[in-house]
Amino acid sequence: MELKQALQKLGKSAEFKKWKKTHAEAFLAHAFVMLDDANKDNVQFGFFDSKSDRMTPFMVEPKKVSALPESEVFKSEQSITPLVMEHVQLTDEKALEIADEFMKKNYPAELPIKTFFIVQHLDLGCVFNITFFTKSLKTLNLKISVVDGKIVKHSFESLISGMM
């Protein structure tokens, strides 16, 4: 499901409208998609409430919308900035195409076994934060601008090296 379409579906849902009445200050902080067969049509949106320092995720599925349990937010040095979907000019399909091309060009021997992405506003700007887990137990992470599709940062790391 396309992100903007999923967000519209969320905004129209009775469950979200009811929740928003008691969380008027909360704002959209991220959109998360796991690209496996079981979840590829689902989008999770996280709404941050700065008064309570809590995140409430909503799962948008093809046939239903549901709130998931709220949780405390892991605090890093970086503050949580609103995700303004109107600023997202790149489609998730195009962002994934850019990431896939980068991986094939720079790491042709790596075979992805799991892929997910988060759209969020970081210090680098608003990005598609895409991660590939590979068959060789490595991760490729790319941060791609939602405006122009440029890769603003990437890293390639072994999951095993950190365990030894």
Residue ranges: model-predicted function:
Residues 1-164:
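Long, terminal "pre-/pro-" and other extracytoplasmic accessory regions
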